[in-house]
Structure formats: structure tokens, C-alpha cells
């Protein structure tokens, strides 16, 4: 490949050089004066910036016009320059073609010039150079040798020696040479003189290394085997270090090491003792360095941590010695100092330490070895160890001084720093010993007791140790007593006592022990303020470290001054009579008595352990086999615990209350055996021999009677003591025989840690056998507890006597009851079971399963027996409501047998009554006032009153043979007026007659009556209880209607329905009802005779003496009722009639009637009226129960008929009171008792009548039917009637009013289907539980609306009742709120009627609930998460506009805003003049209302949540007191046209599409 020629400008000698052949401007040559574009731009910018800088410097000196001219010129030049640059850049984009052509031309020019130059050079060589050229004589052999062999061996010697290095020796030769050198060095050391300090060396690799510990290490060698060859110094390593202040750096600089190396090497030449010279030089240098290090450390220690008072450098001679003094505060003649110096007599020895005063040779050498002759050269260690040695020496001397006056005491000297411990007591804790040490800085003695750092004696003892030591024995004795005092405090820390050293005596006692200055303490007992224990402290003569204790018991009294007189009661152990309160505190103490204890007797008694040793060879008896080991280990107490003191204090604290109690028992004339110790020394016991019979005068009563004060609370009996049970002598003797023992002990409550008295009664069996598993043995114990906190022991005894009275009085009843329990004729065992009898309480179980209980006990406060009742697992105890009446009966009769029979016979009816709800309800009379649904008022054990919502009252009397009489409690028993608090119940007699069982009533009469008819009071006795219990004949007359009293139908009234009697009024008058009164504890009932003395006038006279609150007669099944077809068209729609199976209007008849024109003819009721729980007998439907066997319509419908008692069986009462399903099965409401439903319907009917009278828009109409409310509204006639089948539901009958003859017919009327919807809505929403009168107000206001508006409301009612009629397009269900819900906008007060009309506007509330996606109305779908909304709707009748009611400033939720927007849009675009827009607007709202994606939290007055009702589309009531009403699932094909002419709404198969 041909070589590529270089460019011409890159060739040497061509181009711009001086030897080139091309002219500079010749075409084809290299282009000069060219530069790159980037350099050009840099130059332009640099020029512009430079001109701008110069301009900025020169302009301030010129005038304004000159500055403007210069700025303009600068801008013009710069603009022109950059314009040319811009043109150049644009041209450069197309210069590539020109460059290629120029490169080609340049290459051709270069080739041409290359040939020309080659020819010229060859010509010059031939003409000038080669003329004189000659070839040299080449060295052919050398060239051949180099080329063939690659080496050259003919190099001259002079060159070879100077340039070529010699060959290296082999490793074997090297090892042989070093081994030979080691032998030479070893021979030199053996034959030469070697110092003892240099005996440690090692020979390795041809060198010898000498090492002197803690000073230096040096290496030497020799350069030959000639003895005259001098040693050569190889290496020097100084081993002196400063590990405290050196900071890890070397103490010797390398230049110093080099200098020493040169110096020693110079001295090694021609020196016979070369090695000695090496040691002397290096040893002196290292010792000087060590002294310098110690001096530096001392200065730094003195500067940083210590001062001149602790250590001071007294003298420092470099390289010679260093003297440091310490403990400068001690007054020593020589002073304490140490000197570190070199040995002047022998240079080779290390540094020595000299102590002043001198120490022993062993201690001094130990100090030097620790601090100087070690790797860690430290002055601090040297001083510390010196101080430790000095401290041990001084403490040893002090120990000898202590041993001089403290014999047989174990002293201990140990520790670092050294501590001397001196025990002052025996035994003594280490923390209680005196710890003596020496201050390392000052050398002074320091002492303290670790357990008592605040000991005041330590300061004086420390001064004594550092000064005059003659006072040490006395100070030790004071310290011994002081620590003993502290031990006493520690011992009493967990005992109820406090130790003190002095008492505030106003006059110093004469006793020697109480004189000042004696070593003693006073122990105050917390529970006994008048007792002081004096503890005298003494040192044993033989052993001063041991203490002796002497105890004295002192009785003290408190006085405020010298004139204060102290009575004799202070001489007692504890003052029983409370001292009068004084304004001036009694702060001074006076000693009354002082008793000395024998310490041995006090600490050794029946309550202490006995140490006994038994011979190992002695055989144990049978009684000793189970005993603990004979040799018991002695209890070891802590040294700070004084067992003698604790034992004496505990003994006093335990026995003093017993002594006080024993004194109090003696004063109450109660015999006892005194304080004793129980077997095995378990506790103290005080046994009572006998207790007095209750009711007798006690000591406290006698004392108070003597002082003129009333008796104590436990004995202040009422004036009439006849109410107390009589204690027969044989009963008392039997109880005394059963009492085995009465013991009093003292214990501590585990929970409150309070001491209590425990009184144990031990009885022998009981006369009454119980079923309790713990009461089956023959030994029965009763435990009573009393507090010891109070110091009034008389009260404790009185409480004991009161509890004893509980046992005795209850025993008097139990003794008789036990005998009667064995009598099989009374059958008490079948009535009850005795669950427990503990002598204090009698627990009886009764009822069907004997699971309810009655507890009988004696109450001291009420001086009578009390009863408490407890229910069972599956039953409640209904006797709790008449607990006081039963207790009163027991206190009067004193017979448990009668109480048992009453409990047995009244259990079933009271259990039935207990099932009635007693919860308070809101919204009955007023929305904010709660009223009890039922309230039970007990009058006697067999008479109660039952009120309903504080309006109606029932009087129930329990009778024998499982019968109960019920009458209206609103009628007074004493006069013919009505009780003001209550209202008579209309139709009560007819309602109760449906539950009468005639056979049971006849059986009850057969057992108590003669052949003669009964009087009206025949079924009631004077006592008020069952005749079997009271034993009173049932044929007595009424005690309230005797001579001188007129009955309710007195002949003095003119115009009465009955003729005046010719004989005085008697109890056999059938028209003289007896009425109970709440204040009557007992009374009688009435029952009319069987004759028919009745006035058949219909309706009854308005002047009857028993008016009804509404003026209506009670209905009866025998009353002629209008047929349900009289207000229906011939072809009624059965869609809304099929769900009312119990309604009296469901039976259709083609007959017509002129209702409400004239009274109809009597005919049978559509359905027979029979009790829900028994079939109708052959006597006809609706036979009047109780005492009216005739069952005539007139008797049942009389206003006073409810006042006549009606006899019911227990089963019928249970049926009345037990919650049962609603008669209309289609209405889903909570179960409710028939009695509550009947009273609720009567109450609603009464409220409706009052509402008709108060509302101007409602017009009352006269009705010939009793118990029927008839009224009319605008175009409609309404009839509200009680269902006569069961009298538990109200029904509404609506019909169009016929047009007046002189008026035109109304332009718009409701269809028959609309009327059926109204009736059904009234039955399911208004007259259904819970019964609220405000719902009636709302429905009446809706009925009074114009027919066209009412029709739209009827459509909403239809959608409310049957949501499935809405079809698929509805997304919400709707409900009409009849009462104001609390969750709605507060426009109307909560609970009030929320349908408001005024100024041609209607305000009502709707609750809408979102239908879940995919849900089908009527199918069980979970609705709990469906949001619900209460909308306040306002409909304007004049403008025909439906809108949302909004309050100014009210914050509403986004959903409410969307609903308001929909209603406004509907009013704007869908308004029709000839059609009411209410229902279409609501339908549009239910169809198009959408929920926001993120529902915000609603305001407090507007809650959005799931509906209350779950499972159907009916929704829920917005008021929590009105439960949800449900309709049955009715899904099926409907007609093509819906009710009212609106298009038919198909079923809703799912949610919104």
C-alpha cells in the first residue's frame, strides 16, 4: 500500500517556516489569518464588554449631552459589529462546498511541490554533498558477535569496572555470613565486660539488641571478626512514655535521636568499655526524661485538678530529683512529702522514691514499683498510692485507740480508700456502724453513719477524731442511744404507734424514770390516746454495745391549763364517756398512773413460741408424731428491729380493746368469762356467758333515763310496744338451749386494713330445716362484725344487743312456722321451700319452680320485720311492688304462714301485672313531659291500683280460688262523684266480659256462698285479702254503704231512672256500684242482682250521675252496630279490604241503612265476641263477667258499669297483661298486651272527641251508637268506632256527605278507593301503637283539606302504604310524618302535630328513603345503609306551587339543596292550571333526586341516615317513639289504570337504572 502523503503545511520546512519554498500569498498554500468561529465570538464579546467598561468609567466626567452621544456611538458600533457577525454566520452555513474544493486544490498543489522538492534535493546531493563523502572502516567481528550471540564480551576492563555492577551473593552465602557474624558478636560479648543492667539481650541476624526495661532499647553489630574492629551502633529506641499528658506522641525528636546516635558512635571508636559507655549515656538520658515527665504531670495536675493547698513542687533539679509535698493542712513538724531521685552513689540504678516521714522499706518499694518502675509512669498514681499507705497507717493507729475501751468488738479496716468501721451496737448492721476514713486531699479524719446521714453527733465526733480524743467514749455512748431511738421508730413504723422523746407535761411527774435527761422514749398508741408506753433504755455493764429495755404503762389525761379539772373517767383504760368539746385545745399531758411491766413475763406468755430441746434417744409419743420438729430454729430478726418493743406494743394494742369491752359488758350486766387465749395461741377471745332477753331495759337506757336523755337509737321503741312480737317462755328456753357459745374476737379486715370485732354465735341445729348445702349439719354458726374505729364501746355492745334482738324476734316466728310447716293440712310444703335460715335471715322460695325468693328479717331501725324479694332466672318477682304492705301485714299478724299463703295466691296475678310496661313515654299529654305508661300503686296485700298514663285507673283485688276482681278506679268508694285525678274508662265492663270464665266464677262462688244471692260486697272481705287467709266470711256487707250513707243512686235526686226505695239502702242494690279510692287501703265491691230492673230508654238520659268525659256510651257486643256496607258503593274495591280480617267493617251485606239518620234495629254483631284465650260458651257472645250474669246491653253500657267489679281468673289476667301480637297481622308493631291496646284505643278516642270540640273545622254529629265518635269535615263524614270483636283497635269509616237540596253538588269528590286508602291509613298509621294524640290532630287537618288537595295526599298515602305501586322509576320511598320528628328542620316543636295550615298554605313533612340498588319492594333486602331524609314541604293552594320550606341562615345538606332545586324546576316547567301539583311534584322528586358522590356531614338539625324499618319499602317513622309500620308483601298484577285516574304504577323490580 502506497504511503499517504502528509499535508503540505504539516511537513517540516514547508509553510510559514523560514525554510519553506511556497510564498505566503501563493494560491494553494496554507491559509493564514484564519480563526474559528468560537474564537471570533469570544473576541467580539470581549471587545463589547471592554468598551462598555471604559464607557462606564468615563461617562460620569462628561456632560449630559456628551454622555448621550457616547452611548449612541457605542450602541451603533456594537450593532454594526454584531450585524456583520450575523452575516458571517449565515454565510458559514453554505461554505462547506467551497471548503471541499479548496482542500482538493491544496492536496494537488502539495503533491506537485513534493515532486519538485525531491528533484531539487537529489540534484543538490549529487552536486555538493556526495562529492566529498567517504565510508568508515566498520568493526565486522563485533557486529557479527552482537548479531549472532546477543552479547558483547570484548568490552574494555576500565569501562566494565565502572559501569557493570558486581554479581550479588547467594542466599546460602548470606545465611552463612550472618551465622558467622552472630558467633563473632557472641565471642565479643563473652570476652568483654558487660554491665548487670545489660544482661538482657538477644542476638539475631548479625546484630545484638540490649533492652533496659522502661528506659531504652539499642542494637549494635561489628563489621569484621578482628577484635580491634569497633562496635557499630545500628538503632536506638527510647522506651520512656507519658501516657497521661503525652497525647500518644513520642517524647524524643528524631533529630535528638540522630544526635545521640552520632555521639555514642563517636565514643565507641577506640573505647575498651564501649558497651558501658552506651549504657551510661542512654541511662542518664532516660532518667532525666522520666523526671521531666513526672515534673510535667505534677504541674498539670496542680493546674487542672488540684491546687497549691493539696500538692506543691518544692524542688526540681533536672536529671537529679523531684520533691512534691502533700497534706499541707495537717500540722506536722516534718510535713508530708515524697522525693523521686536518681541514686547518686550508683549511676546504674533506677529512680528511687524517698518518703518523709519515712515509710517501711516494703511499702516504699511497693510505691516505687507501682508508679515509677512500671510501664505507666504516673505522678498521680504515685501520690494516690502514697496517700493510701499513709491512710492505712493512721487508721491502724486509731483502731488501737478504739480497742482500748471497746472490748470484744470486731473492727474492720479495708477498702480503697481505706475505711475503718466501728460497730456501736450488738447486733449492728454495717449501715449502722461508724465509717471512718481519711480525706485524700487534706489528710483529715472523716466519719459518718450511712443509715443515718443526718446524725447530729457525727460533726462533734469528727472534731474529736481530728483533735482531742478523750471524749470518744462519751460520744459513742450518745450515738448508741441515738441509733436505738431510730431503731424504735423503725420498729414502730408498721405498728399503730408513734415514738417521741418528750411529752408536754405541765407539771413534771415525780417518778424517777420520767425525770429529764434519762434515756427513754414515749410510745403513743394510735387506737388508745390515753395510753402511753414508756420505754427506758440502758447499756449493759458487761457489754456496752448491748441495750436493755424496761417498759412502763402510763395512763395520761389532757388538760389545757393548770385549772382544768380531770374527772375520774380518765383513770379508765379508755374514756367511755365522751369528753365535752372545748374551744381551747388540750395540749398538755398529765400522768395519772404508771405501771411497770415485767419484761420477761410480758415477752413470754401463751402467745409466744417456746424453744425446747428433746433428747434424740427419747421416743416420740403418738401425739408428737404430727407435731413440728422439736428443735426449732430461732427466729432471726433484722438488727434494726427490736422484737421486745414490737411485742409489747402489739400486746397492748390487742388487749386494751378487750379490757374496755369487758368493762362495758360488765356495766351492761352481761356476764362474761374474761379475756382468754385460745388453744394453740391462735388469738384472744372474750366469751359471753348469756345475753338478756330483748325488750328489757339496758344499762345505756337506764343511764340515759337517769340523765333525762332519750334512749339510744337501737332502743327507742314506739309508745305502743304491742307491735313487738311476744316472746313466749318456751320459745326463749328453746333458743337458750340451742345457744352453745358466744365468742368475741378481734380481726383485721383484709380490704380496708381496719380492725373489727367478730362475734361468733354457735347454735345447735335449727328448728327449721333448709335446703342450703351449708346448713345441713348440727352445728350452726353466725358471725357478726363491728368496727373498732369508734372508741364508744357502749355503742358496740348496743349493736350486739340489737343483732341479738334480730335473732330472737325472727326465732319467735320461725318456731311457730316450723310446727305449721309439718302440718300436712296446710300444704305449706307445696307452696314454698325454705332455701336458707341463718338465724338472722329467713329465705323462702316460692312460685311454680320455687325460683323467686322472699327474705324475712328483723329491722332495728323500723322495729319491725322487713321483706325483700328477688326474682329468678326465668321469672320476675312481682311482690316487690307491695313489699311495704306485706311487711305491715307480717308485723300485725306475726305469722309467716299467712304471708306464705298470700305470696302463693298472689304470685300469678302479680307476675302478670309485672309484665306491663312501666317505662316513661314522651308526647302523651305534651311533647316534652314524660308520662309513665303503667304505674302500680299497692294499697294492701290484696288490693292494688293500676294507672295508665296518669289518666285511667284500674282497681285490682285478689281473691281466693285463683280469682281477681277488676273495677274502674276512677269511681269513688265513698261518694258518687268521680275521683278528680282519673277519668272513667268507657267500655271497661264490656272489654273485661270477653275474658270471663263463667265456670271458674261459679266454682269460686260455690265454695263460699249459700243458695241465697250474694250482696254486692259478697266477694270482698273487710280485711282486703283472700278469705282463706283472713278467715272472714265472704257474705258480709259493705262497710262503706251502711246506715246513714247513700249510694250513688240515692233517691234524693230528682228525675232518677230508678224508683225511690221503700227500705233503707242495702248492699244488694244492683245499681249501687262501689268505687275504690287511691287512699283506701281496703274496701268492698258490688255485684248486681239477676233481676232486670233496667230503663230501656235509648239513648240514656243526659242527667245520669256518672257522666263520661266525652259524653259517649261504652260499646258492647250486644249493641246494634251499623253494617259496614252502608257507606260503601255496591262494588267496592277489595284491594284495601283484604288486609283487615279483624275489622268489623269487612263483612259486607247488600242491605242498606239510613246511617246516620235514625237508630237501627237490634241485630247480631257481625262476629261473635269471645275471649282470645277461650271459646265462647253457650250463653251467647260477650257475656258480662264478674257479678253481672245477666249480660244485658244496658248493664254493660251504663257509665257506672266499670265501677262494678268483674271477676277474672288468673289465666284471663295473664292473657290481659301478656304481650301478644297485634290483632291485625298485617301491621308489624311490637307485641303489646291487650289491656294496653284497649286503654290506648279508649285514650285515642277520648282525645279525638276533645279534638273535635276544640277544632273549629271539625263538626261533631250526634250518634245513636254508644262509643262511636261521629264528626264531619269539608265534604266528608267520619265515624271512629272501636272494634267490638276484641276492642283493641280503632277503625275509621269515611263517606261523602250527600249534597244539600238547595246547593249544587261539589265539583270534585273522592272516589271510593280513595276513601278506603284513608281508612286503611288511619288504621295502620294513626290508631296503631304507639298511641299519640298528635297523630290524630295531623290526620284531622289532612281530612279538612279541599278535596282536590286531599286527593293528592291520598295518593301519597297510597304510595306510603304500598311502595311497590311506584314501579321502576321511583328511587325513593315516601312516608308522611304525622308528628314532628326531632331530626327535621326545627320549624315545629318536636313531637307536635306537623301538619300546619295557615294563609292558604299547608306545611307538612315527608320522610324519603333511598331504595338500595337491586332491591325489590317487599322483599327482604338490607335497608340499614340506605340514607333517609326528612323534607319540610310547603304547598300553596292559591298558586298551586309545591316547594321546600327553608329557613333564613339555615345550613342545609347538598341533598336538601338538590331536592329544593328539583321542586323549583318542577314548579317552573311542569305546572298545570287544572291539576293539583302536589303529588306530581313529589313523584318527580322521588324519581329524579340523586345523592351526592360524597355525602357531607349533615348539620345537627338535619340527619341523613338509614331508615328505622328494615325489610320493606314502607320505611320508618322519623320519630323514634313511633315504630315502623309494615305492610304485607303484595306483589301481583294490577289494573291498567291506577286509583284516582293516574296511570298505573307497575311493580318496582329493582333500583334506579
Curated annotation (Swiss-Prot):
Feature: compositional bias, Polar residues: 1131-1155
One GO cellular component term: mediator complex
UniProt name for this protein: Mediator of RNA polymerase II transcription subunit 14
Short motif (LXXLL motif 2): ranges: 472-476
Presence of keyword Transcription regulation: yes
GO MF assignments: transcription coregulator activity
Subunit description: Component of the Mediator complex, which may include CDK8, MED4, MED6, MED11, MED14, MED17, MED18, MED20, MED21, MED22, MED27, MED28, MED30 and MED31.
The entry's keywords: Activator, Nucleus, Phosphoprotein, Repeat, Transcription, Transcription regulation
Compositionally skewed regions (Low complexity) per UniProt: 1024-1039, 1065-1080, 1515-1534
Positions where Phosphoserine occurs in the chain: 615, 1015
Main location: nucleus
Amino acid at each position: 500500500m502506497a504511503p499517504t502523503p502528509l499535508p503540505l503545511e504539516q511537513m517540516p520546512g514547508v509553510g510559514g517556516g523560514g525554510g519553506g519554498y511556497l510564498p505566503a500569498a501563493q494560491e494553494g498554500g496554507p491559509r493564514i489569518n484564519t480563526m474559528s468561529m468560537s474564537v471570533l465570538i469570544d473576541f467580539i464579546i470581549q471587545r463589547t464588554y471592554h468598551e462598555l467598561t471604559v464607557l462606564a468609567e468615563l461617562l460620569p466626567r462628561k456632560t449630559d449631552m456628551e454622555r448621550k452621544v457616547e452611548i449612541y456611538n457605542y450602541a451603533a458600533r456594537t450593532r454594526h459589529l454584531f450585524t456583520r457577525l450575523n452575516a458571517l454566520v449565515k454565510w458559514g452555513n453554505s461554505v462547506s462546498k467551497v471548503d471541499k474544493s479548496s482542500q482538493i486544490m491544496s492536496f494537488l498543489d502539495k503533491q506537485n511541490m513534493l515532486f519538485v522538492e525531491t528533484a531539487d534535493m537529489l540534484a543538490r546531493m549529487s552536486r555538493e554533498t556526495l562529492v566529498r563523502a567517504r565510508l568508515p572502516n566498520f568493526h565486522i567481528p563485533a557486529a557479527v558477535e552482537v548479531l549472532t550471540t546477543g552479547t558483547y564480551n570484548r568490552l574494555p576492563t576500565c569501562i566494565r569496572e565502572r559501569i557493570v555492577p558486581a554479581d550479588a551473593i547467594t542466599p546460602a552465602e548470606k545465611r552463612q555470613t550472618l551465622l558467622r557474624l552472630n558467633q563473632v558478636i557472641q565471642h565479643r560479648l563473652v570476652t568483654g565486660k558487660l554491665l548487670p543492667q545489660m544482661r538482657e539481650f538477644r542476638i539475631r541476624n548479625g546484630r545484638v539488641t540490649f533492652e533496659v526495661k522502661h528506659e531504652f532499647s539499642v542494637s549494635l553489630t561489628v563489621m569484621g571478626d578482628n577484635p580491634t574492629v569497633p562496635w557499630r551502633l545500628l538503632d536506638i529506641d527510647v522506651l520512656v512514655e507519658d501516657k497521661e499528658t503525652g497525647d500518644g506522641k513520642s517524647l524524643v525528636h528524631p533529630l535528638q535521636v540522630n544526635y545521640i546516635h552520632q555521639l555514642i558512635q563517636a565514643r565507641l571508636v577506640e573505647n575498651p568499655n564501649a558497651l558501658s559507655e552506651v549504657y551510661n549515656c542512654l541511662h542518664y538520658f532516660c532518667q532525666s526524661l522520666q523526671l521531666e515527665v513526672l515534673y510535667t504531670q505534677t504541674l498539670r495536675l496542680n493546674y487542672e485538678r488540684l491546687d497549691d493547698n493539696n500538692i506543691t513542687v518544692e524542688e526540681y533539679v533536672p536529671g537529679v530529683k523531684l520533691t512534691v509535698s502533700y497534706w499541707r493542712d495537717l500540722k506536722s513538724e516534718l510535713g508530708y512529702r515524697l522525693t523521686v531521685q536518681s541514686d547518686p552513689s550508683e549511676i546504674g540504678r533506677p529512680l528511687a522514691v524517698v518518703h518523709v516521714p519515712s515509710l517501711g522499706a516494703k511499702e516504699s518499694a511497693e510505691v516505687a514499683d507501682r508508679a515509677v518502675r512500671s510501664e505507666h509512669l504516673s505522678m498521680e498514681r504515685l501520690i494516690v498510692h502514697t496517700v493510701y499507705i499513709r491512710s492505712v497507717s493512721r487508721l491502724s493507729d486509731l483502731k488501737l485507740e478504739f480497742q482500748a475501751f471497746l472490748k470484744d468488738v470486731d473492727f474492720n479496716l479495708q477498702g480503697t480508700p481505706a475505711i475503718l468501721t466501728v460497730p456501736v451496737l450488738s447486733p449492728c448492721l454495717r449501715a449502722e456502724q461508724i465509717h471512718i476514713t481519711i480525706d485524700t486531699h487534706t489528710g483529715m479524719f472523716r466519719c459518718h453513719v450511712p443509715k443515718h446521714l443526718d446524725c447530729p453527733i457525727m460533726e462533734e465526733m469528727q472534731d474529736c477524731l481530728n483533735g482531742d480524743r478523750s471524749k470518744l467514749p462519751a460520744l459513742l455512748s450518745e450515738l448508741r442511744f441515738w441509733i436505738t431511738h431510730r431503731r424504735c421508730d423503725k420498729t414502730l413504723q408498721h405498728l399503730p404507734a408513734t415514738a417521741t422523746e418528750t411529752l408536754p407535761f405541765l407539771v413534771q411527774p415525780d417518778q424517777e424514770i420520767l425525770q429529764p435527761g434519762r434515756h427513754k422514749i414515749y410510745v403513743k398508741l394510735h387506737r388508745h390516746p390515753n395510753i402511753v408506753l414508756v420505754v427506758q433504755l440502758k447499756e449493759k455493764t458487761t457489754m456496752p454495745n448491748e441495750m436493755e429495755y424496761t417498759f412502763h404503762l402510763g395512763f395520761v389525761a389532757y388538760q389545757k391549763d393548770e385549772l382544768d379539772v380531770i374527772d375520774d373517767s380518765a383513770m379508765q383504760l379508755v374514756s367511755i364517756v365522751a369528753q365535752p368539746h372545748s374551744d381551747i385545745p388540750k395540749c398538755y399531758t398529765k400522768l395519772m398512773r404508771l405501771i411497770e411491766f415485767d419484761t420477761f413475763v410480758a415477752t413470754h406468755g401463751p402467745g409466744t413460741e417456746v424453744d425446747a430441746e428433746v433428747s434424740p434417744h427419747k421416743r416420740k409419743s403418738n401425739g408428737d408424731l404430727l407435731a413440728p420438729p422439736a428443735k426449732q430454729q430461732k427466729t432471726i430478726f433484722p438488727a434494726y428491729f427490736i422484737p421486745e418493743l414490737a411485742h409489747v406494743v402489739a400486746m397492748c394494742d390487742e388487749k386494751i380493746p378487750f379490757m374496755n369491752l369487758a368493762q362495758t359488758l360488765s356495766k351492761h350486766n352481761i356476764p362474761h368469762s374474761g379475756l382468754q387465749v385460745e388453744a394453740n395461741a391462735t388469738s384472744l377471745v372474750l366469751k359471753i356467758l348469756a345475753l338478756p332477753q330483748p325488750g328489757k331495759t339496758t344499762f345505756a337506757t337506764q343511764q340515759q333515763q337517769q340523765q333525762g336523755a332519750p334512749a339510744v337509737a337501737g332502743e327507742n321503741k314506739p309508745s305502743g310496744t304491742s307491735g313487738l312480737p311476744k316472746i313466749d317462755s318456751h320459745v326463749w328456753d328453746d333458743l337458750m338451749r340451742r345457744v352453745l357459745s358466744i365468742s368475741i374476737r378481734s380481726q383485721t379486715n383484709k380490704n380496708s386494713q381496719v380492725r373489727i370485732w367478730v362475734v361468733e354465735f354457735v347454735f345447735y341445729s335449727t328448728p327449721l330445716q333448709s335446703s342450703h348445702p351449708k346448713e345441713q349439719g348440727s352445728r350452726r354458726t353466725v358471725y357478726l362484725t363491728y368496727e373498732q374505729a369508734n372508741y364508744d364501746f357502749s355503742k358496740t355492745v348496743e349493736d350486739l344487743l340489737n343483732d341479738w334482738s334480730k335473732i330472737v324476734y325472727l326465732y319467735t316466728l320461725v318456731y311457730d312456722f316450723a310446727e305449721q310447716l309439718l302440718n300436712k293440712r296446710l300444704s305449706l310444703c307445696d307452696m314454698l321451700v325454705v332455701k336458707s335460715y341463718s338465724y338472722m335471715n329467713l329465705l323462702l322460695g316460692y312460685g311454680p319452680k320455687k325460683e323467686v325468693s322472699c327474705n324475712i328479717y328483723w329491722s332495728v331501725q323500723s322495729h319491725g320485720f322487713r321483706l325483700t324479694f328477688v326474682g329468678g332466672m326465668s321469672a320476675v318477682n312481682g311482690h316487690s311492688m307491695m313489699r311495704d304492705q306485706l311487711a305491715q301485714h307480717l308485723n300485725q299478724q306475726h305469722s309467716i304462714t299467712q304471708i306464705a299463703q298470700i305470696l302463693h295466691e298472689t304470685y300469678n296475678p302479680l307476675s302478670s301485672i309485672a309484665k306491663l310496661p312501666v317505662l316513661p313515654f314522651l308526647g302523651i299529654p305534651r311533647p316534652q313531659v314524660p308520662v309513665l305508661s303503667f304505674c302500680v300503686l299497692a294499697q294492701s296485700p290484696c288490693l292494688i291500683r293500676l294507672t295508665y298514663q296518669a289518666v285511667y285507673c284500674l282497681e285490682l283485688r285478689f281473691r281466693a280460688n285463683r280469682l281477681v276482681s277488676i273495677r274502674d278506679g276512677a269511681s269513688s268508694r265513698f261518694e258518687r262523684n268521680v275521683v278528680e285525678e282519673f277519668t272513667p274508662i268507657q267500655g271497661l265492663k264490656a272489654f273485661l266480659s270477653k275474658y270471663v270464665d263463667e265456670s271458674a266464677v261459679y266454682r269460686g262462688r260455690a265454695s263460699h256462698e249459700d243458695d241465697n244471692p250474694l250482696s254486692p260486697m259478697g266477694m270482698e272481705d273487710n280485711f282486703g285479702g283472700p278469705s282463706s287467709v283472713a278467715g272472714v266470711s265472704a257474705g258480709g256487707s259493705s262497710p262503706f254503704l251502711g246506715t246513714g250513707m247513700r249510694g250513688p243512686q240515692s233517691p234524693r235526686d230528682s228525675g232518677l231512672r230508678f224508683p225511690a226505695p221503700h227500705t233503707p239502702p242495702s248492699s244488694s242494690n244492683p245499681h249501687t256500684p262501689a268505687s275504690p279510692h287511691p287512699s283506701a287501703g281496703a274496701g268492698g265491691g258490688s255485684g248486681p242482682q239477676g233481676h232486670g230492673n233496667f230503663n230501656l230508654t235509648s239513648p240514656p238520659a243526659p242527667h245520669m250521675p256518672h257522666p263520661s268525659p266525652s259524653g259517649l256510651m261504652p260499646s258492647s257486643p250486644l249493641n246494634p252496630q251499623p253494617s259496614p256496607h252502608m257507606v260503601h258503593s255496591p262494588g267496592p274495591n277489595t284491594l284495601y279490604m283484604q288486609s283487615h280480617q279483624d275489622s268489623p267493617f269487612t263483612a259486607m251485606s247488600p242491605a242498606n241503612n239510613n246511617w246516620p239518620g235514625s237508630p237501627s234495629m237490634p241485630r247480631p254483631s257481625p262476629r261473635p265476641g269471645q275471649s282470645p284465650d277461650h271459646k265462647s260458651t253457650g250463653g251467647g257472645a260477650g257475656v258480662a263477667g264478674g257479678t253481672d250474669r245477666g249480660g244485658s246491653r244496658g248493664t254493660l253500657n251504663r257509665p257506672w258499669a266499670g265501677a262494678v267489679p268483674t271477676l277474672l281468673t288468673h289465666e284471663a289476667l295473664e292473657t290481659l297483661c301478656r304481650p301478644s301480637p297485634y290483632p291485625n297481622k298485617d301491621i308489624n308493631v311490637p307485641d303489646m298486651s291487650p289491656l294496653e291496646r284497649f286503654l290506648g284505643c279508649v285514650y285515642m278516642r277520648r282525645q279525638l272527641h276533645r279534638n273535635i270540640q276544640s277544632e273549629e273545622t271539625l263538626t261533631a254529629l250526634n250518634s245513636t251508637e254508644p262509643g262511636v265518635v261521629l264528626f264531619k269535615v269539608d265534604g266528608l263524614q267520619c265515624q271512629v268506632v272501636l272494634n267490638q270483636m276484641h276492642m283493641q283497635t280503632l277503625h275509621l269509616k269515611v263517606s261523602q256527605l250527600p249534597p244539600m237540596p238547595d246547593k249544587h253538588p261539589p265539583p270534585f269528590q273522592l272516589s271510593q278507593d280513595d276513601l278506603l286508602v284513608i281508612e286503611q291509613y288511619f288504621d295502620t298509621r294513626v290508631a296503631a301503637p304507639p298511641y299519640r294524640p298528635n297523630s290524630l290532630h295531623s290526620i284531622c287537618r289532612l281530612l279538612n283539606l279541599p278535596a282536590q288537595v286531599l286527593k293528592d295526599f291520598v295518593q301519597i298515602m297510597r304510595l306510603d302504604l304500598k311502595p311497590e305501586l311506584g314501579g321502576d322509576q321511583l328511587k325513593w320511598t315516601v312516608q308522611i310524618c304525622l308528628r314532628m320528628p326531632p331530626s327535621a328542620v326545627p320549624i315545629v316543636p318536636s313531637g307536635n302535630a306537623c301538619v300546619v295550615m295557615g294563609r292558604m298554605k299547608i306545611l307538612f313533612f315527608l320522610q324519603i328513603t333511598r331504595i338500595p340498588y337491586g332491591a325489590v319492594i317487599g322483599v327482604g333486602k338490607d335497608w340499614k345503609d340506605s340514607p333517609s331524609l326528612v323534607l319540610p314541604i310547603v304547598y300553596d293552594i292559591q298558586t298551586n306551587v309545591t316547594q321546600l320550606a327553608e329557613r333564613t341562615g339555615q345550613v342545609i345538606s347538598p341533598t336538601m339543596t338538590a331536592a329544593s332545586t328539583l321542586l323549583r324546576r318542577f314548579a317552573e316547567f311542569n305546572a298545570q292550571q287544572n291539576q293539583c301539583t302536589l303529588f306530581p311534584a313529589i313523584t318527580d322528586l322521588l324519581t329524579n333526586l340523586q345523592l351526592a358522590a360524597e355525602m357531607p356531614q349533615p348539620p345537627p338539625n338535619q340527619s341523613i341516615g338509614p331508615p328505622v324499618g328494615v325489610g320493606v319499602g314502607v320505611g320508618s317513622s322519623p320519630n323514634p317513639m313511633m315504630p315502623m309500620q309494615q305492610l304485607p308483601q303484595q306483589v301481583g298484577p294490577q289494573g291498567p289504570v291506577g286509583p284516582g285516574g293516574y296511570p298505573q304504577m307497575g311493580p318496582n323490580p329493582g333500583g334506579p337504572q
